Amino acid sequence: MNSVILSRACRVVLGLGILLVAACAAPPKSAQAVHPVETTTVESALYDQYQAWQGTAYRYGGMSKAGVDCSGFVYLTYRDQLGMQLPRTTLHQSRIGQAVSPQQLQAGDLVFFLTGPNTRHVGIALDKHRFVHASKSKGVVVSSLANDYWQQTLWQARRVY
């Protein structure tokens, strides 16, 4: 066997072993990548998810097309489209990854809002201006971050991949 091919195969096996050990040892509050996704693919995957879920009704605690809440939609999107395991709740999702400014938003960044004294909301940035989320009034929709309501309630943005 060609030594270059053998060397690459050894690096892949070693890398997979390291990833497996790291995933088992990782704290539960971090996102765990099943496979990395390129940024250009993220936007396409998000639009695929949006098209499949568009209009799905909001249901607190929901995790299906019969009804889904905001953190459930984020959880399912990351799992099914991006191959990453995120925490299930908005609060726990808000504690993972790295903070980014709204001006630095990229497709796949999580955007968090404080919509009431003890109420949080989460969506996924499609770009610097729009995000997809499970809205209580409209179900799964794309909204503008330029909207006054979303600008006033924006709490933070986080990059988890």
Where are these regions (language model features)?
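Recognition helices and adjacent regulatory flanks at domain boundaries
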Residues: Y47-Q51, A57-Y58
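Bacterial Sec signal peptide processing site at the extreme N-terminus
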Residues: I18-V42
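...with weaker cross-activation on analogous glycine-rich loops/strands in unrelated enzymes
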Residues: P36, Q85-N147
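Glycine- and charge-enriched low-complexity intrinsically disordered segments
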Residues: W150-Y161
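Catalytic cysteine-centered active-site loop
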Residues: T56-A107
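Sec-dependent bacterial lipoprotein signal peptides
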Residues: M1-C24
